[in-house]
Amino acid sequence: MLQKFLICLSLIFTLASANLFDFLNNQFQGGNGGGGGGRHQNGGSKSPQQHEEAMLNANCNTYLCPDTGICVDAPKFCPCPYPSSQLRCFLPDGRYVCISKPAGYGIADKYNDPQTNFKIDAKDDNIRDCGWVNRAWRNEKLKK
């Protein structure tokens, strides 16, 4: 009787483990067996090859933004890939970086306007905005 119980228990454990590993494999490899890093290949996303092909065949006579594939007059006009959740912060050397917008009660609303959000400096090193990026670039800290 004990042997049958142990056999049944080991069978159940084996099946549960197989299902768990299959679930984890789909989560971390995008379900396509190709190491997608958690990205699912659905209608809205492109494979790296499709992205490269679209970039190479883009009809742009000025500047093609590498992150978004949008045609603009100059690199400084490239938008961030996720403008609703990112700030475009200009560096002193003319380049820019996209960072996550600050979040929190009473803070996030200040950063909603893309025409002015890069100008805001909370003057607080605990709030990661464009002012913080520029201080980090210059290796400065706020004096307390």
UniProtKB/Swiss-Prot annotation:
Signal peptide: 1-18
The keyword Signal appears for this protein: yes
InterPro entries: LCL2
Keywords in alphabetical order: Signal
Domain of life, source organism: Eukaryota
GO biological process, one term: ERAD pathway
The keyword Signal appears for this protein: yes
Entry-linked CDD domains: LCL2-like
Role this protein plays: Probable component of the endoplasmic reticulum-associated degradation (ERAD) pathway.
Family according to the record: Belongs to the LCL2 family.
Name the record gives this protein: Long chronological lifespan protein 2
Organism name: Lodderomyces elongisporus (strain ATCC 11503 / CBS 2605 / JCM 1781 / NBRC 1676 / NRRL YB-4239)
